[in-house]
Amino acid sequence: MTTQSLETLVETLSNLTVLELAALKKLLEDKWDVTAAAPMMAVAAGAAVGGDAAPAESTEFAVILEDVPADKKIGVLKVVREVTGLALKEAKEMTEGLPKTVKEKTSKSDAEDTVKKLQDAGAKASFKGL
């Protein structure tokens, strides 16, 4: 791309409304199969440079949906909708192209409960500290 076309792109993006930007974000996430989340590893790596300090236990956790057997998909879909509040279409998308993060920045007890619900529905799920 030329500098002029990049400037035109920046100008176009600058004129978008918040709703249009949210729609653009969703389209890019779907197209590239990524999520727009801030990288947490950089913060953790910077804290580890400090030296002898013992690593603190995480207070925030992410729940990861790893696998959904075909015969359990409907039950898992219901649980995903229940724990996330997503609409049917978004919940269905979340159960495809796994692994996917179902919940982020949640407490340990909430993460454990969510994983248990997903596993009871037949999914393979886990949680990890952020």
UniProtKB/Swiss-Prot annotation:
Chain segments carrying region Disordered: 94-114
Superkingdom assignment: Bacteria
A biological process term (GO) from this entry: translation
Entry-linked InterPro entries: Ribosomal_bL12, Ribosomal_bL12_C, Ribosomal_bL12_C/ClpS-like, Ribosomal_bL12_oligo, Ribosomal_bL12_oligo_N_sf
Any one annotated GO CC term: cytosolic large ribosomal subunit
Alphabetical keyword list: Ribonucleoprotein, Ribosomal protein
Gene3D superfamilies: 3.30.1390.10, Single helix bin
MF-aspect GO terms: mRNA binding; structural constituent of ribosome
UniProt entry tagged with the keyword Mitochondrion: no
Pfam families in the cross-refs: Ribosomal_L12 (PF00542), Ribosomal_L12_N (PF16320)
HAMAP family for this protein: Ribosomal_bL12 (MF_00368)
Subunit structure: Homodimer. Part of the ribosomal stalk of the 50S ribosomal subunit. Forms a multimeric L10(L12)X complex, where L10 forms an elongated spine to which 2 to 4 L12 dimers bind in a sequential fashion. Binds GTP-bound translation factors.
Family: Belongs to the bacterial ribosomal protein bL12 family.
Stated role: Forms part of the ribosomal stalk which helps the ribosome interact with GTP-bound translation factors. Is thus essential for accurate translation.
Protein name: Large ribosomal subunit protein bL12
Top-level taxonomy: Bacteria, Pseudomonadati, Chlamydiota, Chlamydiia, Chlamydiales
